[in-house]
Structures are given as structure tokens and as C-alpha cells.
Amino acid sequence: MARRAVKAKSRAKVKAKAPRRGRVASARRVTAAKRKTAAKRKTAAKSKTAAKSKPSAAKRQRPIELYYWPTPNGWKISIMLEECRLPYVMKPVNIAAGDQFKPEFLAISPNNRMPAIVDPDGPGGRPISVFESGAILQYLGRKTGRFYPSDERARTAVEEWLFWQMGGLGPMAGQAHHFRIYAPERLPYAIDRYTNEVNRLYGVMNIRLKDRPFLAGKYSIADMACVGWVSRWERQGQDINDFPHLKLWLETLMARPAVQRGMKLRVEEASQVDMKDPKVRSLLFAQRARTA
């Protein structure tokens, strides 16, 4: 009798445990299902956020209009557009044919100088035109968040060298080009003045690049602004071998695919311009103020 009582109790315990195990298993299944549902919702939310943050395909394909001719100033912008892989359509401004004086171009660039851009997707989604190469580089840097740092200290370094080029290297090298190559007569004083100043500026760059690969530390719009001018060192009466750090910098930039692509645009067409043609020389070198 005692044995039967013990067996009966054991059976009762087993029966009592069975529902508990079932309830635990069921609870686990419910928890797992809830986790899966939550994970799916999270993934869906992330997908929606990503979709919102990405511009539509149609919007991405709206090209920037680049008003351009192959000069050191024009190259700045074609290089930046290539580096950023921004879609653009090139609108040639043949400065030897007077395209820079056409009313439609003056509406974009009142200084009758290229480069200039029109961005159909400007601030607020409205088109914006920008002239002056330095201003365009800054605009594109802000637009893309590339090659123009947001950190104030780093950005200041980039701006220092960008403005150094705009106010120094570009104008002085341009005058060296003019008096060494295009002037109708040789003027020793002018040739020496600008050749020597370009030499001084190359020395400034060479010292700056002694302990860093790029002008502002990292590759930036400051380097893009300078490379076209330095690439023409022979025209400026310089020997790049006198500036080893500058030479290495130039070789590094000229090896970049985007720089190569940007500097190839329309070069062949520009090379066919006859710079001895009086009409061409008048358009480029003899302009005076125009009345409205």
C-alpha cells in the first residue's frame, strides 16, 4: 500500500510539472516572436530613414553647368567636380572668340571671366550661379562635404592657402606668362619682376610642403587651386628641380585620375588658338571698362 501511495504521488508531480514546462516553452516562443517582430520593425525604420536621407535618382542626375575653358583657373573647378564625382555638363567659354562677353554669360559671371557654375540643386532646392574660382571651390566643398573640412582649425588652414593662391600665385604666375610669352615686345624689367616673384612663391610652397604631403595637411581645394599653375612652371621661367618638396607634391597630384581628367577637357581645341591674331589679343589683353 505504501509503495502504491508513493507511485501515485510521483505521477501527480509529473502531471503538475508538464503544464509548467509547456507554459515556459510557450512563453519562450512568444518572446522569440516578439524579438523577431521588433527586429523587423527596426530594420524597416532604418530603411525608411536611409531612403529619406538619399536624394532621388532624378535629383542626383541633375548636372551642374560648368562654364569653362582650359586654363589654370578653369582646371580648378573641373578637377573638383571630377574628384567629387558630381554630374556636370561642360559649357565651353572660348575666351579667344569672345564668348565671355555674351549677355547670357555675363548674367552668370558679371566680371566676364570664367570659370562659373550654375547648380540647379542649390540652397533650398533652387538654382544658384557662382562665379570666381575660389568661391566656386568653397561652394562645392560645402555642398559635398569633401576637400573642405568643417573643423574650424582645419578649414582655416585650407582657406589660408586658397586665398594665398587667389591673391598671389595666380596673379603673379599669370603676369609671368604674359610678359614671357604673350607681350608684343620684351620688357626685361617686367619679365624679371614676375619671374622672380613666382620663384619666391614656389619657395614658400616648397618650405610648406617639407613636412606635409599637402598644403593644408590633407588633400583639399587649396591643392586643386594651385596645381594648374605649378604644372606650367616652365612657362614661368622656373626649374621645378630647384624645389624638391614642391616637385613631389606636383607629381603626386598629377598622378591622381581626377586631376588628369579635369585637366584634359578641351585642351586640344584651346591649343589651336592663334595667340598672334590681333583680334584674339584684343579680346584677351586690351579690354577696357564697358558702359551698361
Where is each model-derived feature located?
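Low-complexity, polybasic segments enriched for Lys interleaved with small residues
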Residues: A2, V6-A45, T49-A51, S56
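GST-like domain detector, emphasizing the conserved glutathione-binding G-site
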Residues: R3-A5, R11-K15, K48-D192, N196, ...
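Active-site-flanking alpha-helical
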Residues: M80, G141, W229-V230, M263
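Short, solvent-exposed turn/loop segments enriched in Gly/Ser/Thr/Pro and often Arg
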Residues: N94, I221, R266-V267
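Short secondary-structure boundary/hinge segments and terminal tails
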Residues: G98-D99, E251, A270-Q272
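Flexible loop residues that form catalytic
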Residues: G122, W229, V267
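GST-like fold's C-terminal all-alpha helical module
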Residues: R153, Q165-G262
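Acidic/histidine-enriched, glycine/proline-rich intrinsically disordered or flexible terminal extensions
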Residues: V267-A292
